[in-house]
């Protein structure tokens, strides 16, 4: 590239004629412009504020001058030497005076003028009201005349705006006087005139001023009462309290609400209630105030705060003692109780699970599921703590409402108008006072209602009213929670109390009385009543989310309704099981379910529940309700909605899932081996397996040692395990062994002797529970029948008086005689609250209640005595043994699985189905070995002979080959291993033998039918199987 050289070596200078450029001058300019805009905006605001202040100042000064001018004019016209010099002769005189007065009067400055005007208006008003000379010359009638006359006079003036301004002025002056403590002086004439005059014009107050008005009235009374005789002020207090609510203005409902929440909620109302006719409060206040919605009314109560609501409760409940025929008062009192329940529940976690040990079913029906009952207990405890701090007036008002005298008086005159509100009231009351639940329900159940010429028990009256209601038709199918429960709450409280009362009646009603329509008022309509209950219960358990949504938005306690209705339905199902009074399959509701889908979803819910409980890793009493498990809810609480065989199949699937989850599905996996001496079978079994706990679910392997100490040959493929379980149960269920006793019907229950309650024996009962659970877990049936009251303990169900008939029929008949005795129980029978327990010749007297030996049984307390005696024999004596047995049983069988069945169904689970033996079913599920085939001559003869057996001989044969006289629940297809017939030689002189451990019949090859019959009958009637030939 060519280079050029021009004689210079410096770069050319760059000259910028625009001046030096700064790189950030743009950003700086933007900031400067923003600052200038801000300064200009602030200047504009300052100028506007200055103008506004100047305007306000000029306005204030102008108004002050304006008021002062009017004040001077009014003083010049109406005063002389500082006193009013005019008497009002006409309404126009009054209007002329106050039209000026309201323009300038200020409470702090013009109080003397306002009080003087008020005094003179009162003088004029008193002249309007004539002296009473009629027949009804009472303070109450005189008060009504005053109010009506003044309202009529003022309303005709067509100047409501003026009276509104004047009433506001009077109120402001009264408030100012109270706040400045002027009333504490000796002279209160000015304030009394203000209040008296204000009482007449109070209907013109704005709704926003009513609360202040009533607060001022009560404060005035509270401050003046200790210093003056109230007799002179009774008329003024009556007028001031009742005039607003007695007016015919549009503000009447607001006045009534203000009266309720600011007068009746005052703790000093009880001292002035004599000034106010109760019927005026009832007619004017409650009927108008309840135009408010349920939610608005309760919301207003909650805004008052708990202390005020307690005061309100005391005053309203006191009114209720005399005005118990008024439905509006009952309804409002119900709302008050709802508010107190909400206050008490705010600090309680409604889903805390509390472990409680309820052994003695000593009180009521145990109607509540564990979680909900615990929640109620905590709410009631919180309420009781606050209740204890209330005044004696409040406590006496509550005590009166739950007394026998008041309940009898009120419910005797219950009507269709008051029924729902009274039901609401007492349904909430028994939640706040759970210790009085039993007595309240008993008092109500004993009442005979009188409506017109018809006398009925409360339960029948309530049912008749409900069956005539528009919602009754909704219960003829599955209950639609979402669309029904959110409205018409009165019907649900009515149904709630009916359920509670009838449950209490059943608790003291024996079966014979239940089936007598003279002693059981609902017996003629029992089918309809049970239809309502089952459809209600199904809806509440199935539509869980809908019920939860309604529970959040409604005053109806859905949980209480669900628990109570479920408990009653379960009671009625048990009664029907003992003696049927409903059609066959009445309780089945399977038409509402696709059983295949139900089973699949129930298995999924159970698996999720098992995982959740495993993660929690705590021990607690199982809860039979969960919002996330609707199908398990139904299975655990009302399993009778579904067919029994469906539930059996579902149980088998649950057991299979549990085995798979724990690795027990393989028969030879994780074997636990034990050597068992036949003559020490229980002791060796206890030593080998007691400490296994839940691990006993897994496969076990048994080696037997005979009575000579020789180890028996054989590999345990399940048969020896079955023989071990059936043999050990046969041993301990023998009453001579000492662990069990039997009823006259040969039904087993734990021994009640003292030695049965020592620690070692209780461990034996726990082990037996584990063994029975193991039998069910493995599908092994045992030949044992248990008393229903004992099986009920496995389910956590209480035992009832009628269960005594199976334990001790003589005792049962004696208590029934006592219950129905018409004479003088105390003198004729000379009983006291004790029982005599004799053991090994030693008699012990046991008190049923403290100092029971000194308390006589009377006509009044005999039901308590009957209940306590039943509880002692069915519960107290058995509690420790049953608890130990159940603890062992539930280690193997999940309580949720167990809850799917009724007592009688669990007996079938343990010992098989008490149905006739189906020989054809047995033949279809038989296998052959050793040379026999289905068409072998001996086999053909065998089935002919077996089919001709009597039913008793058929059962003996089944017991001969399986160890149990009843077939499996799902038929012989469920027999494991399958029934097998094997050749046992050709010697026809030998008898058939059996190996019950593997359901095996060893049958010689008999050639004639008669020989086969004789030999088979001899074998099965002998009761001996293995080795007998």
From Swiss-Prot:
InterPro entries: E3A/B/C-like, HECT_dom, Hect_E3_ubiquitin_ligase
Any one GO MF annotation of this record: ubiquitin protein ligase activity
UniProt record, GO biological process: ERAD pathway; protein polyubiquitination; ubiquitin-dependent protein catabolic process
Domain HECT: 692-1029
This enzyme's EC code(s): 2.3.2.26
Any one Pfam family match given in the protein's UniProt record, by short name: HECT
Subcellular location(s) of the protein: Cytoplasm; Nucleus
Catalytic reactions on record: S-ubiquitinyl-[E2 ubiquitin-conjugating enzyme]-L-cysteine + [acceptor protein]-L-lysine = [E2 ubiquitin-conjugating enzyme]-L-cysteine + N(6)-ubiquitinyl-[acceptor protein]-L-lysine
Domain IQ: 46-75
Uppermost EC category: transferase
Catalytic site: 997 (glycyl thioester intermediate)
Keyword Ligase attached: no
Protein name, per record: Probable E3 ubiquitin protein ligase C167.07c
Organism: Schizosaccharomyces pombe (strain 972 / ATCC 24843) (Fission yeast)
């Amino acid at each position: 590239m060519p280079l050029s050289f021009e004689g210079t070596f410096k770069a050319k200078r760059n000259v910028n004629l625009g001046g030096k450029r700064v790189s950030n001058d743009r950003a700086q300019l933007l900031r400067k412009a923003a600052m200038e805009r801000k300064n200009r905006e602030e200047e504009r605001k300052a100028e506007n504020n200055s103008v506004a202040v100047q305007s306000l100042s000029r306005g204030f000064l102008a108004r002050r001058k304006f008021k002062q001018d009017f004040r001077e004019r009014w003083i010049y016209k109406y005063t002389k030497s500082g006193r009013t010099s005019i008497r009002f002769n006409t309404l126009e005189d009054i209007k002329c005076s106050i039209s000026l007065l309201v323009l300038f009067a200020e409470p702090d400055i013009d109080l003397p003028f306002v009080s003087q005007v008020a005094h003179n208006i009162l003088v004029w008003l008193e002249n309007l009201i004539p002296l009473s000379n009629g027949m009804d010359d009472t303070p109450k009638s005189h008060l009504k005349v005053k109010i009506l006359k003044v309202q009529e006079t003022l309303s005709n003036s067509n100047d409501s705006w003026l009276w509104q301004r004047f009433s506001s002025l009077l109120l402001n002056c009264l408030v100012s006087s109270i706040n400045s403590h002027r009333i504490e002086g000796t002279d209160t004439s000015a304030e009394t005139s203000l209040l008296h005059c204000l009482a007449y014009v109070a209907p013109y107050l704005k709704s926003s001023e009513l609360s202040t008005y009533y607060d001022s009235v009560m404060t005035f009374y509270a401050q003046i009462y200790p210093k003056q005789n109230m007799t002179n002020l009774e008329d003024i207090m009556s007028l001031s309290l009742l005039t607003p609510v007695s007016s015919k203005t549009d503000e009447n409902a607001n006045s009534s609400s203000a009266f309720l929440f600011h007068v009746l909620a005052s703790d000093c109302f009880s001292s002035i209630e004599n000034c106010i006719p109760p019927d005026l409060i009832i007619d004017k206040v409650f009927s108008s105030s309840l135009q408010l919605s349920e939610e608005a009314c309760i919301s207003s109560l909650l805004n008052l705060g708990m202390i005020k609501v307690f005061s309100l409760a005391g005053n309203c409940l006191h009114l209720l003692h005399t005005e118990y025929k008024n439905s509006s008062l009952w309804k409002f009192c119900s709302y008050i109780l709802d508010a107190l329940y909400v206050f008490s529940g705010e600090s309680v976690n409604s889903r805390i699970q509390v472990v409680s040990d309820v052994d003695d079913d000593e009180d009521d029906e145990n109607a509540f599921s564990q979680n909900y009952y615990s929640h109620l207990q905590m709410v009631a405890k919180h309420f009781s703590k606050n209740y204890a701090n209330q005044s004696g007036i409040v406590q006496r008002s509550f005590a009166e409402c739950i007394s026998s005298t008041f309940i009898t008086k009120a419910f005797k005159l219950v009507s269709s108008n008051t029924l729902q509100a009274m039901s609401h009231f007492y349904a909430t009351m028994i939640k706040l006072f759970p210790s009085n639940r039993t007595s309240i329900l008993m008092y109500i159940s004993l009442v005979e209602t009188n409506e017109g010429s018809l006398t009925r028990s409360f339960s029948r009256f309530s049912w008749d009213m409900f069956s005539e209601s528009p919602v009754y038709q909704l219960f003829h199918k599955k209950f639609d929670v979402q669309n029904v429960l959110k409205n018409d709450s009165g019907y649900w409280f009515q149904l709630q109390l009916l359920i509670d009362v009838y449950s209490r009646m059943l608790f003291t009603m024996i079966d014979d009385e239940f089936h007598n329509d003279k002693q059981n008022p609902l017996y003629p309509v029992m089918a309809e009543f049970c239809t309502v209950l089952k459809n209600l219960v199904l809806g509440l358990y199935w539509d869980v989310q809908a019920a939860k949504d309604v529970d959040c938005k409604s005053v109806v306690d859905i949980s209480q309704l669900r628990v109570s209705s479920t408990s009653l339905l379960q009671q009625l199902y048990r009664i029907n099981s003992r003696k049927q009074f409903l059609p066959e399959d009445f309780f089945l509701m399977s038409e509402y379910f696709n059983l295949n889908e139900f089973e699949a979803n129930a298995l999924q819910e159970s698996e999720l529940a098992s995982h959740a409980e495993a993660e929690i890793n705590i021990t607690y009493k199982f809860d039979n309700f969960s919002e996330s498990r609707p199908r398990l809810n139904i299975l655990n609480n009302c399993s009778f909605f579904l067919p029994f065989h469906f539930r059996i199949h579902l149980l088998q699937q649950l057991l299979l899932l549990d085995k798979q989850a724990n690795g027990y599905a393989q028969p030879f996996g994780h074997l636990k081996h034990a050597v068992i001496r036949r003559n020490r079978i229980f002791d060796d079994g206890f030593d080998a397996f007691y400490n296994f706990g839940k691990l006993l679910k897994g496969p076990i392997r048994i080696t037997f040692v005979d009575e000579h100490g020789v180890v028996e040959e054989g590999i345990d493929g399940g048969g020896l395990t079955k023989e071990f379980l059936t043999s050990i149960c046969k041993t301990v269920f023998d009453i001579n062994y000492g662990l069990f006793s039997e009823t006259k019907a040969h039904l087993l229950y734990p021994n009640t002797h003292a030695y049965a309650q020592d620690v070692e024996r209780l461990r034996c009962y726990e082990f037996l529970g584990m063994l029975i659970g193991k039998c069910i877990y493995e599908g092994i049936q045992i030949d044992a029948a248990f008393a229903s009251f004992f099986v009920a303990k496995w389910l956590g169900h209480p035992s009832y008086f009628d269960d005594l008939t199976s334990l001790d029929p003589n005792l049962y008949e004696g208590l029934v005689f006592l219950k129905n005795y018409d004479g003088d129980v105390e003198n004729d029978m000379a009983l006291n609250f004790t029982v005599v327990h004799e053991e090994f010749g030693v008699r012990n007297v046991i008190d049923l209640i403290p100092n029971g030996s000194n308390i006589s049984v009377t006509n009044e307390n005999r039901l308590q005595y009957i209940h306590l005696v039943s509880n002692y024999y069915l519960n107290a004596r058995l509690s420790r043994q049953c608890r130990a047995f159940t603890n062992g049983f539930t280690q193997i069988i999940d309580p949720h699985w167990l809850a799917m069945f009724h007592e009688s169904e669990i007996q079938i689970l343990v010992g098989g189905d008490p149905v006739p033996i189906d020989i054809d079913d047995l033949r279809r599920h038989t296998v052959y070995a050793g040379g026999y085939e289905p068409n072998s001559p001996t086999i053909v003869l065998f089935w002919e002979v077996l089919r001709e057996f009597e039913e008793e001989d058929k059962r003996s044969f089944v017991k001969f080959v399986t160890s149990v006289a009843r077939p499996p629940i799902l038929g012989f297809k469920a027999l494991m291993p399958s029934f097998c017939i094997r050749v046992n030689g050709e010697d026809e002189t030998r008898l058939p033998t059996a190996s019950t451990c593997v359901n095996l019949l060893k049958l010689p090859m008999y050639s004639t039918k008669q020989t086969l019959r004789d030999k088979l009958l001899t074998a099965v009637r002998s009761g001996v199987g293995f080795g007998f030939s």
